[in-house]
Amino acid sequence: MANLRSVFEQLNDVSLRAVIQEEAYRDIKLTIKETKTYNPYAHPVAVADSLEKLGIETNPFAVKAHTHAAAKTIELDMYKIVSFYLPKENPTTFMFMKRSKLQYFRRGPQQKDVFLNAHIEPKDVARYDVDTLFDKNVTPQITTNTAFMGDTLHFLPLTAIERIFKSSPKLQTLYATMVLPPEALHRLHSLHPGIYELEFHQEHFIYKPGGHAGAAYIHKYEQLEWIKVGRFKWADEKGLTHMVTSQILETKGANHLFIFQRGRFLTPELRCFSTETKYVTMPPIFLPKQFNARLPIKKTTAQQLFLYVKSVKNVTERDIWAKMRQLLKTSELQDYNPREVTLLVNYFLLIARLRSETCFDNVLSGGMFKKLFKPFIAWWEIQKHKIFGNEEFEQLMEALEWVDVTLTYPTKTFDNRGWVVKLEARRGYEWFADEMHKPKGPELNLEEKKTDPDAASYEKYLKALSLLQKEPEVMEAKEAEATDEPQRPEVKEEQAEASTSGRAEEIQEDPATKKGKEEPNPNRDLLCPCGLHLKIKNAEFPELPVLDHPDHLTGRKAWFFSKDGKPYSYTGGSHASRGWPNWLEKILAAIEIKEPLPEFNQCLVQQFKLQAAIPFHRDDEPCYPKGHQVLTINHSGECLTQIACQKGKASITMGFGDYYLSPVGFQESHKHAVSNTTGGRVSLTFRCTVQQNKFNDDGSMEALDNLPWKAWIPKLQNLGFQGRQLQYDPNGALISPIEEIRSMPKCKPEGVPEVVYKTLDGLARAPTPYSPNPIRARAYTSDVKNCRIGALLRQQGKEWGCRFDALVEAGKRELAISVIHGAGGSGKSQALQTLIKDNPELDITVVLPTNELRLDWLRKLPKAPQEKFKTFEKALLAPPTPIVIFDDYGKLPAGYVEAFCLYFSTVQLIILTGDCKQSVHHESNENATTSSIEPLVKEASELCRYYINATHRNKKDLANKLGVYSEKTGLTEVTHGTTPIPGLHMLVPSLYKKQAFSEMGHKVSTYAGCQGITAPKIQILLTEETSLCSREVLYTALSRAVHSIHFVNASPNNQAFWKKLECTPYLKAFLSTLREEVAQPIEEKKAEPTPVEPPRTHIAKEDAMVEYENVIEKMPEKHEREIFSEKHGHSNCVQTEDPFIQMFSHQQAKDDTLLWATIEARLVISNPKANWQEYLEKRPVGEVLFESYKRAMHLPKMPIPFEEDLWNSSMHEVQKTYLSKPENMIKNGMARQSPDYDPNVISLFLKSQWVKKMEKLGAIKIKPGQTIASFHQATVMLFGTMARYMRRMREVFQPAHIRINCEMTPEDLSSWAAGEGGHWKFKGPSLANDFTAFDQSQDGAMLQFEILKARHHSIPEDILDAYLTIKTNSKIFLGTLAIMRLTGEGPTFDANTECNIAFTHTKFNIPEGTAQLYAGDDSAIDGLPALRPSFKMIEQKLTLRSKPQVALQQKGDWAEFCGFRITPKGLIKDPKKLHASWMLEKKKGNVKNVLRSYELDLALAYQHKDSLHELLSEEELKYHYETVRSIVKSGGGGVLNTYISKDESLY
């Protein structure tokens, strides 16, 4: 081992070390996996070391606790050991064992084991099932030849073996585990203190596993005899002696596994038990005997004490006591008795005083004569000492004769025979029963099997079990048989009933009764005089489509159809082909569901006139092969069908749905005719110009001797195909299920198991020599090294890439290869999967191009270890097994397989599976070297012995159109549409469309990327890119469907719309191209109220500008007000030299100082884990908020059903709004429209604005601005749709006394508040909330509120998950943001408004019917509601804070809402704020652009004329009048003029 270790240490190559580590890791993983079953517990280090010395592995990462984990582990390990001895097939009897422990014996219900238990102790009542109990006073009979008893036999007397074997003649072998510490024979303390402890009493001793008294065993000392007995003897009534031989199979600590075998066998004469520590006992050197130290002591301790007392001069008793205390650990002191310690000290005190220098002479000194007499002298000295006493040296030697405690005992025989039998045995007459005639176990003879009910039931059980085990395979075989074999005609109900009843008289009917039946037999025979039976059958056929432009013949019209497009000519007519429409396949399918049909590639549809006829003729034109069969269908109407031969004629009337198939040779031996047709009678005649399949009467297919692939039929049958059908592609060419057959040499690589080679050779896929192409391999390694390709490999670092490239460059080798090519669904991987399933121990690595395909393999092989299956990049990071399977290898990068083989020299055999006719890997990076080399499939095709051109996936019609052989019957449904069908797997031509439709919620794959997918139904998106796809790519896409294909061609016709869609490459990814027709709303004309002329008066003219002087005087100098940053300098918010303009802060997006100050003030950086934790912690608060909101908004108690139409309408509204933007704005957002844009990434901008809030005019210090978050456009539109949808739903249930300022004009709000029947009462103070950091404070509680609200609206869960993700994972360039509201999310306004409502109603107890207005973070309530007491309980859990603003609702003090004053006359603008904003625009010279909007705002108050004296204070009137004069002088007044008469002036 030391040499091997030194060799390993000298290995400095990283790849070689990785190989060794990988091999070691596999073993470690298997070991840890096994510990989860037998040793799942956490152990202290010392205990774990003890267990490993006993051969029991311990998982160092285990955390499971147990009161006596070590003892329990040994118990389970004993079960594992005995599991290897128990029979694998036959049942075993388990005694005193719970059923739940059967798993530790690696057994299950398939063995049908028997359990025998008894209630002996009270705890047994809860442990054992009632159906397993036996009478504890009667020894049960064991009916199996093997039994097991767990940890119980040691409590029973030795006679128990006789009773068990005597009562069970079938029993041959009994396995039993016992817990008997052998050291208890010597009253030794536990030899394994970490595993168990011992406590000794006068007649009993106690075994405590793990020192835990709750699981203790109380034993008598005589029970220890079990570990010494090797044979048990007893005599039966006849005097015959029986014997059972016992032997210990394993012993670990106090746990022992015994085997008791009926009969006389050899057993070891000694029983030995191991000890971790050696013990010795001191010889008795004192009298009386009771004063000798007799308990064992550790030999190491004894040696230490002996050396100590002999190394110290004049050692005293106190010295020995001190040394004893030094040597004994504190934890060990409890194991020593003070009396024994005292006796031990006296023993060592005595030997300390004895001389250790020998008293005898040596043999080295003296001359020859002296040496000659020295032995005699020595003898004499010994004899003298015996008489007169020993010298001290001799006394010391005698005192040091320590006795080693070895725990080895001779085996005994327990003889329970009577004294007479024993006496005869001593005289040589000991009789034993003949072992050849002793009772057997379940091995019974034939007669016994017939009479033994247990054996019969057991046989039935095994048979049923085998069927259950094979059920998956049986079901697969049945499905294959159903697809391979033609379906038989259905058995009629009368026949089925007769066959099941078993009474023949029930099917005997009177002819008159048959005639009176309402449902005649649809199968009739046309009997020809020559004896030919032409069976006329009936079926329900689908309606025919309207057929135009017929060919006109005598008495009929005709339409000809053919698959190959060739015309049809015959004597008297010629027809051009009209193709082969799908409805013809449906006509044939109506018959094929009842019986198999041969191939047909032509059909003549004829519509007859009244009494039309076709004379006798044959369909034996030269274009048809000899012996071909013709199918004639009477689709509608009636006719008289006649046949004729040399012996005569026969006729029959055919009606609706009748048809017949002419037998082989009919066209050569018979003629047929049609006459007496009804008007409009339609017939279909199917023929075939190529060789047809032939079927027997029972539906089975006749064997064709001239099949080109006849020799390959056994291989096809192994794949689940019959291989006997003749099938043709659309061009009429015969489809061969086996193609591209090649012959090449075979090789059998070393290290490949025989079962693998035989499997491949049986498939005719024997390995052949292969030398990887180094040029292709270098191309791949170069791309990896230079990070041109790959995802996972790019993260391995430059060093790994260089080493990878160097090893491949230096590699040159030859290995074995087996290439398996076949169509999709041909079963090319099935044999390999079966090989892995049946041989799980094989070292095989499966490399897969995608994770989807890896999951598919795991689904098919759920019991196989997951590490066998790796994606291609991960496979390069760990050494593989000698056999590697590359499934669907065409999707691997070019050069990968070659690089893999050269990189790993341990690979001996590679198996490639794929389809050379399907798409291959495409490298999108044009700079990559691998993008310019050919795919491996071309080279691998030359190493493939044959191609399987057959499929189980596609139905025959679709497969044949693709040129593939299929025996799956039925029709593939093909539909067309302009919109995708939700839920169907969609195939698209490009990657960006895949990303786009994936974002819309579709399950999407590209044409090329769908390889390996099988779906019952698929939909294929057709675009202008479809025509650019190769044949292989289209073949891949079309071959995915099992039952139906839906083609989607969604192309809007509006050119302006197309232009806007095409302005960026990604816009179509998230826009729906459906059209929506919106009805024009019809507004009802309201009756105009009769105006009341107010008294004419004027407002005093005063200059309002002086009111701002106090603010201007207090303003500091510009740079004192600006924000300063050391990196970016001062901000630039105070602009121009005009003091009035300087009152207003101008925030600009380009101001870096202001941007960083805003980010610092408005944003909080967190991480996803903290965000999720906050969300979880505050979910209860969110539930409270939602309940308050639901009650306030009168939402129904139960969730609102989801309305798909309303969702689509909301989506179109959002898209319409987005598309209404100018084209340049859409182009500016190109990056955010890209599917590659990270949906969690947010671009931040500073909002450019003039701060016009009155409280911020002339601020001494400039305040931070407001950020705008730019999200992924698809995210914005998705959640915008969600918000729009919930808004529409909210409007349905929203009470009349609550209004949200959304899509409403000031006039609408005025009418609602103060109009006729207005909701605002003005009967007391009003309340408004002034929030602090409203957006920043919407934390996890508000997020939970939003989730609950959306879930109540039945928003799909995937959208909610996405919303949770974006809220908890949103990140900017500084990191992940905390949960908060961001301007630009999509649902910002609606979410802010609803959070405001929820918070307000949670905080205040607002009476029902109180008028309320909400808009974002603004609100106003017509009243002063009381604070809810419950709000104080959750206030500290909410980040959001609000300061109530109370208005007395009297002159000059009205409720404020969104810059409006809510007055009894309606909503008006705040006069002072309006005046200040207007003067700012005027001084900026921007009057022309804003004049009309300001005049409209002013008109809200101006229209009330002199009534303003009742609403506004004197100061407010001054501002109002000054604004009117300034606007009129600036060229306005057009709107104001509409409120005065002609003879009035504007001011």
UniProtKB/Swiss-Prot annotation:
Keywords noted in UniProt: ATP-binding, Helicase, Hydrolase, Multifunctional enzyme, Nucleotide-binding, Nucleotidyltransferase, RNA-directed RNA polymerase, Transferase, Viral RNA replication
| Span of domain Alphavirus-like MT | 59-227
What sequence ranges are listed for the domain Fe2OG dioxygenase?
A: 599-690
Cited InterPro entries: (+)RNA_virus_helicase_core_dom, AlkB-like_sf, Alphavirus-like_MT_dom, DNA/RNA_pol_sf, IPNS-like_FE2OG_OXY, Oxoglu/Fe-dep_dioxygenase_dom, P-loop_NTPase, RNA-dep_RNA_pol_alsuvir
- Reactions accelerated catalytically: RNA(n) + a ribonucleoside 5'-triphosphate = RNA(n+1) + diphosphate; ATP + H2O = ADP + phosphate + H(+)
Domain ((+)RNA virus helicase C-terminal): give its ranges: 949-1082
Could you tell me which residue ranges the RdRp catalytic domain spans?
1324-1431
Q: Where is the composition biased (Basic and acidic residues)?
A: 477-495, 503-522
Job description of the protein = RNA replication. The central part of this protein possibly functions as an ATP-binding helicase.
Q: What is this protein called?
A: RNA replication protein
